[in-house]
Amino acid sequence: MPKSKRDKKVSLTKTAKKGLELKQNLIEELRKCVDTYKYLFIFSVANMRNSKLKDIRNAWKHSRMFFGKNKVMMVALGRSPSDEYKDNLHQVSKKLRGEVGLLFTNRTKEEVDEWFTKYTEMDYARAGNKATFTVNLDPGPLEQFPHSMEPQLRQLGLPTALKKGVVTLLSDYEVCKEGDVLTPEQARVLKLFGYEMAEFKVSIKYMWDAQSGRFQQMGDDLPESAPESEGESEEEDDS
């Protein structure tokens, strides 16, 4: 009798070992960066998008960025004065809560601040985001959509029909009001009609100077109770 695929045993020891190796490698990489670069900046991310963070990594190939795995980063840097890797790094660890990351660089404080202050990218809002403006659709043909899309639009709540093979909005339709917490359906409609409401923004919050060990605040303070970010995006790129 052939064995059922359900009976296949998976070695948890191998999985655990691999996970431990990845964490150890990340710790070593972080400490290597502490030894290599002049400055360490903590940044926060609003409306996280992996693709847009990758664009920043490409623009900052001369530096190193780490995002996600906050607990592992805290182990690498040290949580207290007694176990910190270098002077005052425990102050960095205290701020690793929520959607934050680390930037190691030789660029000056002024250069970093100027670049990230100017950088912003718009994207489509997701369910749970707040609408930043009201969107109303006027009745009439929606020629940007193929006829095969009509049932999907109707399912999303739009009053549509096919008229002579053209998708047509039969009456005025309010997609959302400013301040609404968007539903999945609203977010989908906004994307289909090309309305971008989410601003992807990276804000520099703190700086640590490797030479002096000085830790200083640069932007608004981060909330102490923010949830920890544990599985988001790529930890680092090669420099």
Swiss-Prot record:
Compartment(s): Nucleus, Nucleolus; Cytoplasm
Species lineage: Eukaryota, Metazoa, Chordata, Craniata, Vertebrata
A Pfam match: Ribosomal_L10
Chain positions covered by the region annotation Disordered: 216-239
Protein name, as recorded: mRNA turnover protein 4 homolog
Subunit-level organization: Associates with the pre-60S ribosomal particle. Interacts with MINAS-60 (product of an alternative open reading frame of RBM10).
Known role: Component of the ribosome assembly machinery. Nuclear paralog of the ribosomal protein P0, it binds pre-60S subunits at an early stage of assembly in the nucleolus, and is replaced by P0 in cytoplasmic pre-60S subunits and mature 80S ribosomes.
Matching PANTHER family: MRNA TURNOVER PROTEIN 4 HOMOLOG, MRNA TURNOVER PROTEIN 4 MRTO4
Compositional bias per record (Acidic residues), positions renumbered to this chain: 221-239
Residue numbers of Phosphoserine PTMs: S225, S229, S233
